[in-house]
Amino acid sequence: PTRRVVSFLGDSTLFHAGLPGIVNSLFNNHNHTLIVMENGTTAMTGHQEVPSSGRNFNGPVERIPIRQVLEGLGVKRIWEVDTYRMDALRQAVEEALAEEGFKVVIAKHPCMLKFTRETRRKGKALPPAVEITDACTQLHVCVSEFGCPTYQLRPDGSVWVQEDLCIGDGSCKPTCPNGAIVSQRRPAGKEA
């Protein structure tokens, strides 16, 4: 069959609800690619730590590595890629989709929202925000394909950055084929 099934789980959801589905996929030999988004936090409920982060509410604890959990369940094909290495991530997903059976791509990068909040609390300079330069030719790749809510369209079709939504991680910069997205330094303490 040419049909491919792809699903996504965050690292927190993997631990609290995803493991039975993985066991089911393995047991039934599903042709299924799972992408685990490992950012080290439970963002949807307030940035609590997850078992793979090495911390709990009391402080440091022994990590429970996602890869080891998956291997323990019997997953044979696992790719681990830094989410910000977009070419490598794309390659890993394409390789996984080309194979039969159940396989997992672990897309890893710390949560930048949590990072910027911690940085701000410490009074350090925040990561740079981004701005759109005159090199923008309104291809709108940053809006339509990258999908960051920071990017907004004006009625005339030009793109602007809603700075209070920008976390400054720079992951968007390679998406513009014209190089119109550039960094802009922010002072310490300014809201990310």
What is the predicted role of each segment?
Residues 95-150:
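Glycine/aspartate-rich loop-and-adjacent alpha/beta segment that forms the canonical ThDP
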Residues 4-5, 31, 77-78, 174, ...:
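N-terminal export/assembly segments and adjacent metallocofactor-ligating motifs
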Residues 46, 130-132, 186:
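A broadly tuned "polar low-complexity/structure-edge" signature
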Residues 115-116, 137-162, 167, 171-189:
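Iron-sulfur cluster-binding cysteine motifs and their immediate structural context
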Residues 55-58, 127-138, 163-167:
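Short, contiguous acidic/charged loop-to-helix segments that flank catalytic cores in large enzymes
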Residues 1-106, 112-119:
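Thiamine diphosphate
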